[in-house]
Design a protein with these regions (language model features):
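HINT superfamily self-processing domains
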Residues: 1-150
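Metal-centered catalytic cores of metalloenzymes
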Residues: 105, 149-185
Length: 185
């Protein structure tokens, strides 16, 4: 499946932890089993790839951990235990990422890169957990947890209205309203 835009993807050469060992993301196929996790329950398992995406982008974020640089599109979600799912562009040096062995690694550097011309980038949908682990190179044994973002849509500011603490006599809270469209049509 090919689409333009490269919303949430990784560059060719990014390694994915699979049941058959480390595999370059561009070589992942439907039916392959990738190591996945549910960070809410702590459950980990090999899960099947159900769909592959090839996109194009001219914008990347370089996430450096232990001297290795993982290159993704800016909106690709990484799991930060203290923050939850965090887009690559929102990561900061000092953020902690989860490794496939259950340990943690610290983000050393984030760099935003604009390319002169678009390049191919890759992603895929994983059954159940919708997550997988990536690394910068095949020799690494440190794979970080990322979300495939399929079936997951973040709130877009222009689609919603938030009313924060409308009654000051209550504990702090917010009401989120989806903006109506096409009323009366």
């Amino acid at each position: 499946y090919t689409a333009k835009g490269g919303n949430v993807c990784f560059v060719a050469g990014t390694q994915v932890e699979t049941a058959d060992g480390s595999t370059a993301i561009e070589n992942i196929k439907e039916g392959d089993r990738v190591f996945a996790a549910n960070p809410e329950t702590g459950e980990v398992a090999y899960k099947k790839v159900v769909r592959k995406f090839v996109n194009e982008t001219n914008e990347l974020v370089e996430v450096t951990v232990n001297g290795e640089t993982i290159k993704s599109t800016p909106s690709h979600p990484f799991y930060v235990p203290q923050k939850g799912w965090t887009s690559a562009i929102s990561l900061r040096a000092g953020d902690i990422l989860v490794l496939s062995n259950g340990e943690y690694v610290i983000v050393e550097q984030i760099q935003h890169e604009l390319l002169e011309s678009p390049i191919k980038v890759y992603n895929f949908e994983v059954e159940d957990f919708h997550t997988y682990y990536v690394s910068a190179n095949a020799d690494s044994d440190e794979f970080v947890l990322v979300h495939n973002r399929c079936g997951y849509k973040p709130l877009r500011q222009n689609d919603y209205k938030a009313v924060i603490n409308p009654d000051e006599t209550e504990a702090p809270h917010a009401h989120i309203f989806k903006k109506a469209s096409n009323i009366g049509r």
